[in-house]
From Swiss-Prot:
Source superkingdom: Bacteria
Name of the protein this chain belongs to: 5'-nucleotidase SurE
Record organism: Bacteroides fragilis (strain ATCC 25285 / DSM 2151 / CCUG 4856 / JCM 11019 / LMG 10263 / NCTC 9343 / Onslow / VPI 2553 / EN-2)
Chain's gene name: surE
Catalytic activity: a ribonucleoside 5'-phosphate + H2O = a ribonucleoside + phosphate
Database matches in PANTHER family: 5'-NUCLEOTIDASE SURE (PTHR30457), 5'_3'-NUCLEOTIDASE SURE (PTHR30457:SF12)
Family membership: Belongs to the SurE nucleotidase family.
Length: 255
C-alpha cells in the first residue's frame, strides 16, 4: 500500500490575499500535501463565528502538485468545516491557521479567527496549530519565523497533541529571535477600546482600537512577556472551558 504524505489543511483570518498565508504555505510545503481554504476577504476578530443566515460558497483558485487552493465566502471556522466535509477525501493530519498579521497572545485568543480555525480542527480530533506575528503591516517580514514554523509543524506531525489541546504560537517582531518559551496565557484586558469616527450627520461611528493592559507585566512565564523580550511564545491551549476547580463549590450552592 502506497504511503501518503501528510495532509495539511491551512486557513487564516486575514483573507486569501494576505502575505502571511502565502508565507505559511511556503514554509509548510516540504512537510506534506497542502490544501488551503481561506476567506475571500479579511475576517479578523471573528473568533469561532459561523455563517448561519446565508449560504457559503467556495471557489477553486489553484491546483498544483502538492498544493490546492480555495477561497470561501465564510468565516475562518466555516472554511475548516467546509473543507473537512465537502472537499477533502480523508481526514487532515494537521490543521494550521495563520500566519496572522498581529499577535494572538493573552486574552486575544478569545477573539481570534486564527484560533477559531485551530479550535475547529481540535474539536474534530485533528492536531492543530495557530501561528501569529506581532506585526500588523501588510508587508510584514516572516523570514525569521519560517524555520520555527517548519520545526513546530514537523514535531506536531510526528508526536501529535493530547485530545482537545492545540498550540498557540506567537512570533515577536524581530529578525533576532532569542529562542522559544513555553508560556502560560497572559492575564489582562483591553482599555480605551473605541475611537470616535464622526460622519456628516451622525457622530455614532467608532473604530475599535485600545491598549492591552497586562495584569502581570513582570510575569516571565506568560506569552506577553516572552514576545516583548524577543522570544517565540508557544502556549498549549485547551478547548474544554469547564472550570473544574469551581464545580464542587457550585454544587454546594444546591441550586
Amino acid at each position: 500500500m502506497e504511503n501518503k504524505r501528510p495532509l495539511i489543511l491551512v486557513s487564516n483570518d486575514d483573507g486569501i490575499m494576505a502575505k502571511g498565508i502565502s508565507e505559511l504555505i511556503k514554509f509548510l510545503r516540504p512537510l506534506g500535501e497542502i490544501v488551503v481554504m481561506a476567506p475571500d476577504a479579511p475576517r479578523s476578530g471573528s473568533g469561532c463565528a459561523l455563517t448561519v443566515t446565508q449560504p457559503v460558497h467556495y471557489q477553486l483558485l489553484k491546483k498544483d502538485v502538492g498544493l490546492t487552493v480555495y477561497k470561501c465566502s465564510g468565516t475562518p471556522t466555516d472554511c475548516i468545516k467546509l473543507a473537512r466535509n465537502q472537499i477533502l477525501d480523508r481526514k487532515p493530519d494537521l490543521v494550521v491557521g495563520g500566519i496572522n498579521h498581529g499577535d494572538n497572545s493573552a486574552t486575544n485568543v478569545h477573539y481570534s479567527g486564527t484560533m477559531g480555525i485551530v479550535i475547529e480542527g481540535c474539536l474534530n480530533g485533528i492536531p492543530s496549530i495557530g501561528f501569529s506575528i506581532c506585526d500588523h503591516a501588510p508587508g510584514a517580514d516572516f523570514d525569521a519565523a519560517g524555520p520555527y514554523v517548519r520545526r513546530i509543524a514537523a514535531m506536531v506531525l510526528e508526536k501529535g497533541l493530547p485530545p482537545l489541546t492545540c498550540l498557540n504560537v506567537n512570533f515577536p517582531n524581530t529578525q533576532e529571535i532569542k529562542g522559544v518559551r513555553i508560556c502560560e496565557q497572559a492575564k489582562g484586558h483591553w482599555s480605551g477600546e473605541w475611537q470616535a469616527c464622526p460622519r456628516r450627520d451622525d457622530a455614532n461611528f467608532y473604530w475599535l482600537t485600545g491598549e492591552f493592559i497586562d495584569h502581570e507585566p513582570e510575569n516571565e512565564k506568560n506569552d506577553h512577556w516572552a514576545l516583548a523580550n524577543g522570544y517565540v511564545a508557544i502556549t498549549p491551549t485547551v478547548v474544554d472551558m469547564t472550570a473544574y476547580h469551581f464545580m464542587d463549590e457550585l454544587k454546594s450552592w444546591e441550586l
